[in-house]
């Protein structure tokens, strides 16, 4: 089967064509139109995002079809992100997809954005299939999942305040770095000269008590607001002493190390407790090379494997939506006539374990 995917949940207008089955998929095309205008405002402006999607969606779909060298008559179904995300942005994608499916008499498949991130890695790594432990880390979400099978998702833990990507963006602003902050912080942290165990800005690792057990409510959860505040105080101290220019790299390194140590420990706990040898990373923060390296090192010690998508498929894209759409299409799941965009919605098939409540 061949599916056209459409993604407009935030500030990327994307269209892609993916063919095959959940067991063997081929990425035929993927077009992503990023809205760089939001850099001027230091964050995504919802109304501007919606207007940019209106401008970009037709060219994106046309380019995806051309790149795949197919026409709409060659498409078996249209998959579109319907939740979660910015409602106005989502409405652009869902309205266009519904019109397209109706006009060409194609099935319409609604896809949950976060389930799409789980499928992104599968497009490049066929072995990234269940069962596995999944860490979804982006500007809006931080979720730790146990995935025994596609369509079965057990929520183990999540952030109790800021998402990881949000924390990166806010810390980047404190350090005078551009938006989005993930890549600039990673680059700045790499220039810190002192060894990891000696650099002067070592921040506490949130929610990592040595006495913690799987029965504790925070065993898998994360919290980054306190870490963000610690960075704020470090920046103010450096400003007061006139040393901020020299301290920026050290602060960035200390912040990034604290985030990575926290995420790695939570993932290792989940993999150990649920006896998973595979870890799948997803979301924009999964692009962080230091995070990937630390995660691989930790899992290799347990004879495990870590799978992460390339930067193009880690950030929001329609290829992952088409891939998840193939899975849902194979199960016979189609959109109801009254399908609409939803700002917040659990992943279909997800259950919340008691420790994640």
UniProtKB/Swiss-Prot annotation:
Which enzyme class?
transferase
| Cofactor(s) demanded | Fe(2+)
Gene3D superfamilies attached to this UniProt entry:
3.30.420.40
List positions binding substrate: 136-140, 169, 182, 288
What's the short name of a Pfam family annotated to this entry?
TsaD
Residues binding Fe cation, per UniProt: 113, 117, 316
According to its UniProt record, where is this protein mainly located?
cytoplasm
Per UniProt, the cofactor note for this protein states: Binds 1 Fe(2+) ion per subunit.
Gene Ontology biological process terms from the UniProt entry: tRNA threonylcarbamoyladenosine modification
Q: Which reaction does it catalyse?
A: L-threonylcarbamoyladenylate + adenosine(37) in tRNA = N(6)-L-threonylcarbamoyladenosine(37) in tRNA + AMP + H(+)
Query: Which keywords annotate this record?
Result: Acyltransferase, Cytoplasm, Iron, Metal-binding, Transferase, tRNA processing
GO cellular component annotations, sorted alphabetically? cytoplasm
Compartments annotated for it: namely: Cytoplasm
| Alphabetical list of InterPro entries matching this protein | ATPase_NBD, Gcp-like_dom, KAE1/TsaD, Peptidase_M22_CS, TsaD
One Gene Ontology MF term: iron ion binding
Q: Which domain of life is it from?
A: Bacteria
Q: What is its EC number?
A: 2.3.1.234
HAMAP family with a match to the protein in the record: TsaD
- Protein family per UniProt: Belongs to the KAE1 / TsaD family.
NCBIfam families named in the record: gcp_kae1, T6A_TsaD_YgjD
Q: What does this protein do?
A: Required for the formation of a threonylcarbamoyl group on adenosine at position 37 (t(6)A37) in tRNAs that read codons beginning with adenine. Is involved in the transfer of the threonylcarbamoyl moiety of threonylcarbamoyl-AMP (TC-AMP) to the N6 group of A37, together with TsaE and TsaB. TsaD likely plays a direct catalytic role in this reaction.
What is the name listed in the Swiss-Prot or TrEMBL entry for this protein?
Answer: tRNA N6-adenosine threonylcarbamoyltransferase
- To which species is this protein native? Gemmatimonas aurantiaca (strain DSM 14586 / JCM 11422 / NBRC 100505 / T-27)
As recorded in Swiss-Prot or TrEMBL, the protein's gene is named tsaD
């Amino acid at each position: 089967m061949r599916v056209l995917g459409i993604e407009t949940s935030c500030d990327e207008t994307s269209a892609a064509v993916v063919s095959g089955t959940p067991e063997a998929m081929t990425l035929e095309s993927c077009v992503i139109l990023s809205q760089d205008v939001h850099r001027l405002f230091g964050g995504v402006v919802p109304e501007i995002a919606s207007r940019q999607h209106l401008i970009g969606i037709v060219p994106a779909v046309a380019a995806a079809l051309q790149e795949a060298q197919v026409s709409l008559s060659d498409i078996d179904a249209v998959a579109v992100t319907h939740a979660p995300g910015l409602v106005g942005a989502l409405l652009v994608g869902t309205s266009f997809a519904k019109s397209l499916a109706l006009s060409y008499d194609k099935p319409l498949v609604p896809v949950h954005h976060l389930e799409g991130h789980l499928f992104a890695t599968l497009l490049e790594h066929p072995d990234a299939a269940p069962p596995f432990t999944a860490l979804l880390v982006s500007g809006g979400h931080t979720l730790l999942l146990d995935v025994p099978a596609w369509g079965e998702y057990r929520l183990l833990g999540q952030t109790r305040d800021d998402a990881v990507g949000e924390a990166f963006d806010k810390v980047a602003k404190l350090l005078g770095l551009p938006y989005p902050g993930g890549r600039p912080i990673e680059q700045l942290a790499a220039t810190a000269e002192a060894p990891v165990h000696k650099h002067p800005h070592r921040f506490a690792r949130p929610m990592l008590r040595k006495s913690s057990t799987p029965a504790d409510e925070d065993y898998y959860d994360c919290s980054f607001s306190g870490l963000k505040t610690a960075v704020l105080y470090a920046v103010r101290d450096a400003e007061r002493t006139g040393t901020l220019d020299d301290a920026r790299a050290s602060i960035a390194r200390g912040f990034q190390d604290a985030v990575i140590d926290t995420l790695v420990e939570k993932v290792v706990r989940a993999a150990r407790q649920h006896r998973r040898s595979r870890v799948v990373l997803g979301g924009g923060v999964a692009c962080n090379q230091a995070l990937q390296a630390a995660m691989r090192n930790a899992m290799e010690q347990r004879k495990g494997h870590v799978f992460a998508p390339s930067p193009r498929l880690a950030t929001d894209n329609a290829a992952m939506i088409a891939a998840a759409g193939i899975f849902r299409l194979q199960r016979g799941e189609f959109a109801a006539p009254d399908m609409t965009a939803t700002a917040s919605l659990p992943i279909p098939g997800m259950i919340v374990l008691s420790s994640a409540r």
